[in-house]
Amino acid sequence: MANRPTLTEIKMHSRIDTDYEDDYLIALDNSAFDFIRTYLNRDLVLDNTAELTEGQIYYTEQMRICELMLVDSWYTNRSSSEIPKACEYMLNQFRVMNT
């Protein structure tokens, strides 16, 4: 079970020293979380004491790292449409494909 990245952690990961794009970084982070949820086709549960129901999965450290990687990728390459390969490999183990 992992916690969502803080703004400070996002900025450290992306080596950002300024504050003027904080709102943009928060928006990217929320988008990254939503992307992961959609990519996995599962609801992400942050509370590890909650009982999971069908279609849910606990938010893991791998997902947290992918969230940081996505924010960094989208911040650095603002027109990028690809996800980092390492992120894709980490997330695929949790992905549920529609049938």
Task: Give residue spans per PLM region.
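Divalent metal-cofactor coordination and adjacent catalytic microenvironments
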Residues: 1-99
